[in-house]
């Protein structure tokens, strides 16, 4: 009797102890699982915001693409000061990009201007090829593409996918152009008007969409303080002709100009006789050399601050022909003209010209209905 009573009293104690062990194991399992998954959670709320696109640290340092399509009835070279101040753009020619690689810190912005002309079916390929080149250039770089308003839609689609920061300018010319050169001249003036109006400070270069560039070319022209020039090789597919034109240099100092035709081996050269000879004219008193737009670059501040570079007037040119004004300044003020690269012995720009295809329309003979 006594033994049976003791066994009956110990059974509730065993049941209680087994329940306690089960509860302990359950709590331990829950804590282990929560601790395991908590280890994969981010340590701060900022990482969650970054992952959701709320401006965290995963955003790129430099904007890759920007579209600015402007359709203008008339282009004026007189800048709008109020618009420039509202845009918050200064007059300095150096842009701090916050990149400490190589210890450079600050680099001048490159303003690459491209005019569009030629056949539309060839234009897309040329723009994409130049875009691939510009993507290899270290920022800051802005690509200014100019063209008539009628072709703006197709070109805008191409530019959006290039990954290059760009400004797309479409304009309606006031006159009908008789030649492709006249149209390109007007487009360059439209681009310079945009650069002046918005105070885009940097080094301006006119890059042909059909041009081929050395990988180090854009790093070289970024070092330009005022004006720079270099040899350019022009290859013509139709005439099978190769011509190299550019400056004669002593180190980085320009001492003359030359033109060499590799087909017949002839070379023409014009050298400066004295330091004061800024315009080496012939007997007739005319300029002995003209410089192609693809063979020079300049500091954009000459457009709105010419007195800084020794020009007597506050306006670039009363005729609003900015590209002509800049070409004259580059040739006249050779004390500020830098040859690129040093001693100008290397060709870094190639221009490839192709003949324009003229499609003749063949008319079918008219047949008269006979009754």
From Swiss-Prot:
Keyword list, A-Z: Cell wall biogenesis/degradation, Glycoprotein, Glycosyltransferase, Golgi apparatus, Membrane, Signal-anchor, Transferase, Transmembrane, Transmembrane helix
GO MF term set: galactosylgalactosylxylosylprotein 3-beta-glucuronosyltransferase activity; xylosyltransferase activity
InterPro entries on file: Glyco_trans_43, Nucleotide-diphossugar_trans
Protein name: Probable beta-1,4-xylosyltransferase GT43A
GO biological process: cell wall organization; glucuronoxylan biosynthetic process; plant-type secondary cell wall biogenesis; xylan biosynthetic process
Positions in the Cytoplasmic compartment: 1-19
UniProt xrefs under SUPFAM superfamilies: Nucleotide-diphospho-sugar transferases
GO cellular component terms attached to this protein's record: Golgi membrane
EC number: 2.4.2.-
Organism: Oryza sativa subsp. japonica
Places the protein is found: Golgi apparatus membrane
């Amino acid at each position: 009797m006594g033994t049976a009573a003791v066994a009956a009293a110990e059974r509730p104690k065993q049941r209680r102890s087994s329940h306690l062990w089960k509860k302990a194991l359950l709590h331990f399992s829950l804590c282990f699982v929560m601790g395991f998954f908590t280890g994969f959670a981010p340590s701060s709320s900022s990482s969650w915001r970054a992952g959701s696109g709320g401006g965290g640290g995963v955003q790129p340092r430099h904007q890759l693409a920007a579209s600015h399509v402007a359709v203008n009835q008339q282009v004026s070279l007189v800048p709008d000061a109020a618009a420039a101040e509202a845009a918050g753009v200064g007059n300095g020619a150096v842009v701090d990009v916050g990149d400490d690689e190589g210890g450079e810190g600050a680099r001048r912005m490159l303003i690459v201007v491209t005019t569009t002309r030629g056949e539309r079916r060839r234009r897309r390929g040329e723009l994409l090829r130049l875009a691939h080149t510009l993507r290899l250039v270290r920022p800051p770089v802005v690509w200014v593409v100019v063209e008539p308003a009628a072709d703006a839609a197709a070109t805008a689609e191409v530019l959006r996918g290039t990954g290059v920061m760009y400004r797309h300018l479409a304009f309606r010319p006031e006159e009908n152009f008789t030649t492709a050169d006249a149209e390109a001249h007007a487009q360059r003036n439209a681009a310079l008007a945009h650069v002046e109006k918005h105070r885009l400070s940097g080094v301006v270069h006119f890059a042909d969409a059909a041009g081929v560039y050395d990988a180090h070319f854009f790093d070289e022209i970024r070092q330009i303080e005022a004006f720079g020039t270099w040899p350019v090789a022009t290859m013509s597919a139709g005439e099978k002709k190769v011509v190299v034109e550019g400056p004669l240099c002593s180190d980085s100092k320009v001492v003359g100009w030359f033109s060499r035709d590799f087909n017949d081996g002839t070379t023409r050269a014009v050298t400066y006789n004295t330091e004061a000879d800024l315009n080496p004219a012939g007997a007739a008193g005319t300029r002995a050399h003209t410089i192609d737009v693809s063979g020079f670059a300049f500091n954009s501040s000459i457009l709105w601050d010419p007195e800084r570079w020794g020009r007597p007037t506050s306006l670039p040119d009363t005729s609003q022909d900015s590209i002509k004004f800049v070409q004259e300044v580059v040739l006249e003020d050779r004390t500020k003209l830098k040859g690129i690269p040093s001693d100008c012995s290397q060709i870094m720009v190639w221009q490839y010209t192709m003949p324009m295809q003229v499609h003749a329309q063949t008319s079918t003979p008219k047949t008269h209905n006979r009754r």
